Amino acid sequence: MSIYDKISKMLGHESDAEKLYKVLNTDEYKERPYEYSDLGEGMAVIGETMWGWWKHRFLINHNTKCAYEFMDKDQRLVTVTEDDIDWESLKNLPEDAIGRARALSFHFHSFIRHFENGVAEVSWQINPDGRYYMDDDGFGMTDDDEIEIYGFIDQNAKVVVKFKNINEHYGELDKMRKEAEQIVKSRQ
């Protein structure tokens, strides 16, 4: 916490994160179209149903009584910036997928996973499997492959390990988690 945050607290001023926490703990956010999910370590996510899918919108930190808008109503990431993406790992991907990452589009199946040692994996699908485009009669399917990139966030919704394409080498996630845990531990 910065000195300015400490002074604001002493003066009784709430931060935006503290105000959002209070709002998200009202009855409105305890029923549809919202859904509360526990992520462990005093953390939770509030999802919102959009176009028939649950989307992770808000990250809740019960330990600090703060909340963060992770994704906005337009399904764009709020706490992630272009600097939080390992662009080198995306260079051989289709241009449409790279464009979605550049636009910070969180439109497809993407999730904040459980917290462990102060960090959580985020899986961000930047290109869906071709079946995504198929209608009820089976028409419209494309030959697209599902593409997910992965990153790690801390309990303040900040990226600590950049999002990158791991080319389905899931052992890489263990390395990324260890790196994220070290970064968070070194801040304490």
Describe the predicted segments one by one.
Residues 16-187:
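Residue-level detector of conserved, function-critical positions
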Residues 1-3, 188:
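Short, Lys/Arg-enriched, disordered terminal segments
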Residues 3-11:
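Short linear clamp-binding motif
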